[in-house]
From Swiss-Prot:
The chain crosses the membrane at residues 26-46, 93-113, 121-136. Heterotetramer of ERG25, ERG26, ERG27 and ERG28. ERG28 acts as a scaffold to tether ERG27 and other 4,4-demethylation-related enzymes, forming a demethylation enzyme complex, in the endoplasmic reticulum. Interacts with ERG25, ERG26 and ERG27. Also interacts with ERG1, ERG3, ERG5, ERG6 and ERG11. It comes from Saccharomyces cerevisiae (strain ATCC 204508 / S288c). This is Ergosterol biosynthetic protein 28. One of its GO terms (molecular function) is protein-macromolecule adaptor activity.
Length: 148
């Protein structure tokens, strides 16, 4: 069993091994938040997921919420690896593509399928995916040594 001191020491060591700069810390933060978002889709019903798809909330079912939670958790794992190994070009590109998929999903739900509207449930994913994409686009060469 791990003691609290073991957890603290491991956490400090892990954080020290991360690439320098704020982008890896951002990716780690988003990854951690995504874990809680994933869990809530399994345990708290439909209320929070329906806030994202606010224009047509009845189209959100328990199954679609859990599927969304699973997808969010997979994205969380990808972004965690990105936080730890952002200097690796393949990992960087995988994280970047995960945000492109997220932006495409939410953009299509807003503009094509019309299940979302610009409310507070939708703005979080929109701001996170857009901010992350722009930031990563501008910082690729810094972290990977490879220009676009």
């Amino acid at each position: 069993m791990f003691s609290l001191q073991d957890v603290i020491t491991t956490t400090k060591t892990t954080l020290a091994a991360m690439p320098k700069g704020y982008l890896p810390k951002w990716l780690l933060f988003i990854s951690i938040v995504s874990v809680f978002n994933s869990i809530q889709t399994y345990v708290s019903g439909l209320e929070l997921t329906r806030k994202v798809y606010e224009r047509k909330p009845t189209e959100t079912t328990h199954l679609s919420a859990r599927t969304f939670g699973t997808w969010t958790f997979i994205s969380c794992v990808i972004r965690f690896y990105g936080a730890m190994y952002l200097n690796e070009p393949h990992i960087f590109e995988l994280v970047f593509m995960s945000y492109m998929v997220a932006l495409f999903h939410f953009g299509s739900e807003l503009l094509i399928f019309r299940t979302c509207k610009l409310g507070k449930g939708f703005m979080g994913p929109l701001v996170v995916s857009t901010t992350s994409l722009v930031w990563m686009y501008k910082q690729r060469e810094y972290y990977t040594g490879v220009a676009w």
